[in-house]
From Swiss-Prot:
Species in which this protein is naturally found: Methylibium petroleiphilum (strain ATCC BAA-1232 / LMG 22953 / PM1)
Disulfide-bonded cysteines: none
The enzyme's E.C. designation: 1.2.1.10
Class in the EC hierarchy, top level: oxidoreductase
Domain of life the protein comes from: Bacteria
Protein name: Acetaldehyde dehydrogenase 1
GO molecular function: acetaldehyde dehydrogenase (acetylating) activity; NAD binding
Biological process (GO), any one: catabolic process
Keywords: Aromatic hydrocarbons catabolism, NAD, Oxidoreductase
Entry's family note: Belongs to the acetaldehyde dehydrogenase family.
Amino acid sequence: MKKIKCALIGPGNIGTDLLAKLQRSPVLEPVWMVGIDPGSDGLKRARDAGLKTTAEGVDGLLPHVKADGVQIAFDATSAYVHAENSRKLNALGVMMIDLTPAAIGPFCVPPVNLKQHLGRREMNVNMVTCGGQATIPMVAAVSQVQAVAYGEIVATVSSRSVGPGTRKNIDEFTRTTAGAVEKVGGAKKGKAIIIINPAEPPLIMRDTVHCLTVDEPDRDRITASIHQMIREVQKYVPGYKLVNGPVFDGKRVSVFMEVEGLGDYLPKYAGNLDIMTAAAARTAEMFAEELIAGTLKLEAVPA
């Protein structure tokens, strides 16, 4: 089976967890890991796994893209550098899967809108945020039944699972997630809150979703829609679980979720890594299947 060669940019918590997911993929083959700190644990792990590595940032990868056949790159760095990384790699015809909150490309939340990205020839798609991937399916499950005037999500993650890149991007995280609650989730107005909990031992990722419907909620249909959506998410994140709900209070629908990871890099409490990396891998696999079938051709975007 032919595999599409990939590069990972950013050997932090997300990049390292993603590497483990890609190594199991039937259609993706990770060949490069890009960092900026020669001593980083993530670069060492990637080298030990047989990947080529550079500590010179994306500029250290560019000369090797063509020779090594890299067609897809995952950016798990920071919103501040993503636009430049994307521009340089798009110019070489490499498609970007953006795991930062930069959101210069269209949002992708696989169980909600993955299929809509088929055949669109996009060279950059954005995976929103871990909080977005965990909660937007629930907002969408409600909005697919009836209009949602307001959607609010609260993502609680363990301090240990939140690396320096994510911490620098907190404002971008809340803005990007709120925007995707509207654009992908279907809420007229969206709001996002992230809580980084320093408790030891670290807590599992918890997510609370509140929706205010325009009309009186159709409880049976909303409940069925939520359970159906949970099954869709569980196809790629088995540890995605409903803890409580849906709870109905007037026009408010509340859902309380928990996300357990596979423990590929950080232990299972870090479900926030898994929901992001599994969604990114799932998205890239769809594009890789198109590339292998010859129905998608990547074209360089002039810088």
